[in-house]
UniProtKB/Swiss-Prot annotation:
Its membrane topology: Single-pass membrane protein
A GO cellular-component term linked to this record: proton-transporting ATP synthase complex
Domain of life: Bacteria
Entries under InterPro entries matching the protein: ATP_synth_b/b'su_bac/chlpt
Lineage: Bacteria, Bacillati, Cyanobacteriota, Cyanophyceae, Synechococcales
Chain ranges passing through the membrane: 22-41
Name by which UniProt lists this protein: ATP synthase subunit b
Intracellular or extracellular location(s): Cellular thylakoid membrane
Region (Disordered): 76-98
Length: 170
């Protein structure tokens, strides 16, 4: 359109149906009114069914997840109780093992001490026995050395008779 022409003629309404495309608009609006609800309705219905199906699926997953969470919580509390029980049992067991090992160590120390005492005592008794033996041998040697000088014939006969009598008594 020409701008100069519009400026000179002014603003007005055109009532010519064929020039204004009112019929075209009426056909388009009628067609949309008649056919669009069926086509668009089917699309919206499918979309609605899809959304409802997805919502139901999401609710089912939520329910399953909630049930799994509850089961996991129960399992966790059960595992925690079992772990605390195992810990308590292991503490008791370790304490009993420690006490038992301390008892064995004390018994072993007592046995070693007793062994040392008995070794010392047997060593002492061996030494005493050795000293006695040496003292007896020394006394016998001294007696034998001094005996020929002190023993005469009658004393020797009395000694032999006395020894024979002692042997017969025993």
């Amino acid at each position: 359109m020409n701008l100069t022409l519009l400026a000179t003629e002014g603003f007005g309404l055109n009532f010519n149906l064929f020039e204004t495309n009112i019929l075209n608009w009426a056909v388009v609006v009628f067609g949309l009114y008649k056919f669009l609800p069926g086509f668009l309705g089917k699309m919206l219905q499918k979309r609605r069914e899809g959304i409802l199906l997805e919502l139901k699926d999401a609710e089912d997953r939520l329910l399953n997840a909630t049930q799994a969470l509850e089961k996991a919580k129960k399992d966790l509390s059960s595992a925690a109780e079992k772990a605390s029980q195992i810990k308590a049992d292991s503490l008791k067991r370790s304490e009993s093992i420690r006490m038992e090992s301390e008892k064995k160590a004390i018994e072993e120390m007592a046995r070693i001490k007793q062994s040392a005492i008995s070794d010392e005592s047997s060593e002492a008794s061996r030494a005493i026995s050795q000293l006695r033996k040496e003292a007896v041998e020394l006394a016998i040697k001294k007696a034998l050395d001094s005996l020929p000088n002190r023993l005469d014939k009658t004393t020797q006969e009395n000694l032999v008779t006395q020894s024979i009598n002692n042997i017969e008594v025993n």
